[in-house]
Amino acid sequence: MTSKFRRAGSAVAIVAALGLALSACGGSGSGSDGEGGGDTSSITFIPKNLGNPYFDASDAGGKKAADEIGTTWKQVGPTESTPDSQVSFINTATQQRAGALVVSANDPKAIGDALDEARNAGTKVVTMDSDTEPQFRDVFVSQADAAGIAKSQVDLIAEQIGDKGEIAILSAAANATNQNEWIKLMEEELAANHPDIKLVDTVYGNDDDQTSFDKTAGLLQSHPNLKGIISPTTVGIAAAARYLSDSEYKGKVALTGLGTPNQMREYIKDGTVKSFALWDPEQLGYLAAYAADALASGDIEGKEGDTFKAGDLGEYTVGADGVIVLGEPTVFEESNIDDFDF
């Protein structure tokens, strides 16, 4: 089977990719033209929740881009990824006349009114990683093609369990736009191309380490014939790996998903996990900052075909529905995981 995720090949290719890694979604609605304007020297980043290593990496990328641009970047946000937990932070940024917001949405609709108010006040809105409904933002910076992510997750688990048996999904929040899209596409991919793999359960750890750990235990207790788990969330896959590594299921139940090399290195090396994947979240924040600045500066409007330069990442083009795609993720395994540090 083939995977849309790229596996690192030559040492030269790895070094080149690492260089980028260490350097670091439509169109505008009627609210975008509100009078009053914002401060184009300010970008406010609102992740799903604070204390999440994935978003810490995105924050670092955004700060790096802001330094290169000569603008300011700050991160604020909730401690829990509930549907409306970001609203107060959006409202505060609007009152402070931020030039742009970069938001990873916990819910596609719950923050819509707050984002409308921000855009009416002249603030540009970039969603990143997890989108809102398109009418609430100017552009969405997507980590990768959703269908490709879903297919690759299924391919990875199928490879590890011999393309047959029971699997489950450990997701983040039940309302997370990106997670739900991936899960829907994974279900379609399984039905179309993997008739001997049965998805028996989908559970939600809410991007909380302990909850995800407990949900992993619950899956294994509820489904004694489980052969594998897909966790398309960095918090979830790390918590599941921690549980498996000290349990009787180590080496018997496969685990894959989306994780960072630094979180997952020990579990690759001790044999708990064979392979997993991710794009570089630092690059994602880096690209989102450049997109936000291009909008706030008037260089782009968020229309299909608009182009802008994103520092070391090069030129990007806005696609249909205002989507900007970072690129294809990498598969991490024992042979290459030490070549990455994020």
Language-model-derived ranges and their functions:
Residues 10, 14, 39, 174-178, ...:
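Hinge/cleft segment of the Venus flytrap/periplasmic-binding protein
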Residues 41-65, 69, 73-88, 104-108, ...:
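Extracytoplasmic "Venus flytrap"
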Residues 103-119, 186, 205-267:
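Hydrophobic alpha-helical
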Residues 44-46, 97-105, 124-128, 168-169, ...:
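Periplasmic-binding protein-like
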Residues 22-38:
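Bacterial lipoprotein signal-peptidase II cleavage site
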Residues 1-23:
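Sec-dependent bacterial lipoprotein signal peptides
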